[in-house]
A protein has these predicted regions:
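Anion-binding and metal-coordination hotspots
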Residues: 54-57, 62, 76, 80, ...
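Alpha-helical support elements that line or immediately flank enzyme active sites
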Residues: 42-52
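Basic, low-complexity segments
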Residues: 1-30
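Short basic-aromatic helix/loop recognition motifs at nucleic-acid
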Residues: 31-35
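Double-stranded DNA-binding cores of transcription factors and transposases
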Residues: 38-39
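Short, basic interhelical loop/turn and adjoining N-cap
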Residues: 65-83
Length: 509
């Protein structure tokens, strides 16, 4: 039975691909008490996401379910090496190391595993596609009143825990049911007036804390300071007031909920999103596909920056390699970076203003700064480069432009003695992209890209990426990494099952 279960594939292909040496930095080099094998811990965390179980259920399953023991190579152990705190302590170690050294060990491990698994699945990195997905933070979108109240109440509670004296007028923040009284039951003032009252209470508490300096090390104090800085302003007379909506600086990056201070806000596809954004790179073979790399940032991170980061980290690709993504990943710099790595970048949507297609036949110098020839074959008398607008300013003879068949589409500026035309290399590249989008080859690339849309859908439906039970970018990124590994395991399982089915059918025939 084990030979036909998921445990066989995991034990033979996934478990051996887990590189324990990556995590050696977490442990002492001195001989000491033996620790739980790291590959067992990492394997258990992958199975946790793949089978949608909790930490406690994994521990129980390893004690009583032979499939888990077989998958993690622990059948010969007299006692299973995982306890109720093993997984949480390992995650804490990894996060502590990342905070101190800015190195994501889980990402390194998952990417290396994907490389080994892709070799078995005969998937090469010459056909890639990229997509991003919004990952919801496990927080509520608080109103401004709720946000101020929560931050003030949190500071009051930590002051009470440390035995500090809370002013009488602010003492009610630590009383039971005060939140409901202030937010829902106090109807004699509107929400803005109540927010101003809480803001003034915050000012009083900050002054009390500043006088002693005993709370500078607390997140509650720091978050309240941040909130006052982002949402209030001090006028010339020294009084503090709430900022108007247009006065808020970087509204996408302000504090949304003290439970997750790193979560950001973004409008995308007509919806409001609080949290983070994941980016996945999928490599496609003849029979299957695999996520070979991923990234995870605050959701204000641009898609074209994800592409730029990915290309900068990669070495040269083999001839004929390409990567396909939607229009948000486009950009002249990204195309240049891809070309430097022998990779063709194809973006399937066109974003921004569309230039006239006649610009596709304009010829520039190699550095893209000077126009050499226009669509009609005319050579400018004089040409300058405008670094401020990153464009070329060319001057042509009046007689050439007056008789040009493309005059209306080009729309140059006629001066007294000559004609001025401003055009950038970016416009030429975008015009060439428009022409290319009408070809049959581009149509095939667009169909190829559509397949990557399944990844965000799977991560949401099967792996519950929007319900990660922790807060903060580093913590949620750790869970995201294991979900990617679980997704790859499922793809591997489907691949091995297809091979077994093919072999069975061949034998029957």
């Amino acid at each position: 039975m084990l030979e036909k279960s998921w445990a066989k594939t995991f034990a033979d292909k996934v478990f051996p691909a887990i590189d324990e040496n990556i995590f050696s930095v977490l442990y002492s080099e001195k001989a000491s008490r033996p620790n739980t094998p790291v590959n067992v811990i990492v394997g258990a965390l992958i199975l946790k996401e793949a089978l949608n179980v909790t930490d406690d259920e994994i521990v129980e399953a390893m004690a009583f379910d032979i499939r888990y023991q077989y998958a993690l190579h622990t059948t010969s152990f007299e006692e299973q090496p995982i306890s109720d705190r093993t997984l949480s302590r390992f995650r804490a170690r990894v996060l502590s190391y990342e905070t101190e050294h800015d190195v994501d060990l889980i990402h390194e491990c998952v990417v290396k595993m994907a490389k080994e698994i892709s070799d078995f699945m005969d998937i090469t990195p010459d056909k890639q596609r990229m997509d991003s997905l919004m990952v919801a933070a496990n927080i509520r979108n608080l109103s401004l009143l709720e946000l101020f109240y929560t931050c003030v109440a949190n500071l009051c509670k930590i002051m009470a825990e440390r035995g500090a004296k809370i002013p009488d007028e602010q003492h009610h923040y630590i009383e039971k049911d005060d939140y409901n009284k202030c937010i829902y039951h106090k109807r004699d003032m509107d929400a803005t007036e109540r927010t101003i009252v809480v803001m003034k209470d915050a000012d009083v508490l900050i002054k009390v804390c500043d006088s002693t300096g005993d709370f500078d090390d607390t997140s509650e104090y720091q978050l309240l300071i941040r909130l006052l800085k982002e949402r209030t302003i001090i006028d010339g007379d020294g009084s503090r007031r709430l900022r108007q909506k247009d006065e808020v600086e970087n509204p996408s990056e302000v504090l949304l909920n003290p439970s997750d201070p790193e979560a950001t806000f973004r409008y995308k596809a007509g919806g409001k999103h609080l949290g983070y954004v994941g980016n996945v790179v999928e490599s496609v073979g003849e029979k299957s596909s695999l996520v070979i790399d991923y990234d995870y940032q605050q959701n204000t991170y641009a898609d074209n920056q994800f592409m730029k980061d990915y290309l900068k980290e990669k070495k040269d690709f083999c001839d004929g390699s390409f990567i396909v993504a939607d229009g948000a990943y486009s950009g002249e710099e990204n195309s240049r970076l891809a070309s430097e790595h022998n990779l063709k970048l194809v973006t399937t949507n066109f974003t921004g203003r569309k230039p006239d297609e006649i610009y596709a036949d304009f010829i520039f110098t190699e550095n893209g700064q000077y126009l050499l020839k226009c669509k009609n074959g005319c050579i400018p008398e004089e040409c300058k480069y405008d670094p401020h607008n990153d464009c070329s300013i060319a001057y042509f003879k009046t007689c050439e432009c007056e008789n040009c068949p493309y005059k209306k589409r080009c729309n140059p500026r006629f001066l007294k003695k000559r004609v001025r035309k401003e055009v950038s290399w970016k416009s030429v590249g975008r015009a060439k992209q428009l022409q290319y989008m009408k070809t049959e080859e581009f149509s095939e690339y667009a169909k190829f890209r559509n397949g990557v849309e399944a990844i965000p859908s799977l991560l949401r439906r099967r792996y519950h990426v929007d319900k990660i039970p922790v807060h903060g970018k580093k913590r949620t990124r750790l869970f995201f990494g294991f979900k990617i590994a679980a997704l790859n395991f499922q793809k591997l399982l489907d691949y091995t099952n297809s091979l077994a089915s093919y072999a069975s059918n061949k034998k029957t025939a």
